[in-house]
Design a protein with these regions (language model features):
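A short acidic, often aromatic-flanked loop/helix-cap motif at beta-alpha or helix-coil junctions
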Residues: 63-64, 114-119
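Short amphipathic
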Residues: 22-24, 111-115
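Short, surface-exposed ligand-recognition loops at beta-strand->loop->(often short) alpha-helix junctions
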Residues: 26-37
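Short, well-ordered beta-strand segments in beta-rich or mixed alpha/beta enzyme
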Residues: 19-26, 55-87
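Low-complexity intrinsically disordered segments
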Residues: 6, 67, 109-113
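Short beta-strand/turn micro-motifs at beta-sheet edges
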Residues: 7-13, 56-59
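Residues that cap or initiate secondary-structure elements
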Residues: 29-31, 78, 117
Length: 119
């Protein structure tokens, strides 16, 4: 009888596993344009990064809020970590503090990293 479990066996993990960075934001509509500009800036850098396989931004507006998710797929966890350091340097060069920006604009955020798998 075949294994009926919906969970993968160890040999079913994607090889090599890619990494998904999925971020969620809730942005007050009044600050959406400023936030959208930052998202476009970041997305432009990600799309040109040699180890970023895919970058997408999606949004939904309701009740005076804009709900946003960003999804980026990376070759590896090391590639993601290196890209985060590169972006931190770009932010520093431009005098941009992401945490302060989010706080000043009342934007709530959640950042999560997942490893891909084959089911």
């Amino acid at each position: 009888m075949k294994n009926a479990s919906a969970l993968p066996m160890n040999d079913q993990l994607a090889t090599p596993a890619t990494v998904l960075r999925i971020d969620r934001f809730t942005c007050p509509l009044a600050h959406w344009l400023a936030f959208a500009e930052r998202l476009a800036f970041i997305d432009g850098h990600l799309r040109s990064h040699p180890h970023c396989r895919m970058s997408r931004v999606a949004s939904s507006e309701r009740d005076g809020q804009v709900y946003v998710i960003t999804i980026a797929e990376w070759d590896s966890r090391d590639a993601l970590l290196a890209a985060k350091q590169e972006m931190a340097a770009v932010y520093a060069e431009n005098g941009f503090d992401p945490a302060a920006f989010l706080s000043q604009h009342g934007i709530e955020s959640e950042f999560t990293t997942f490893e891909t798998m084959v089911l």
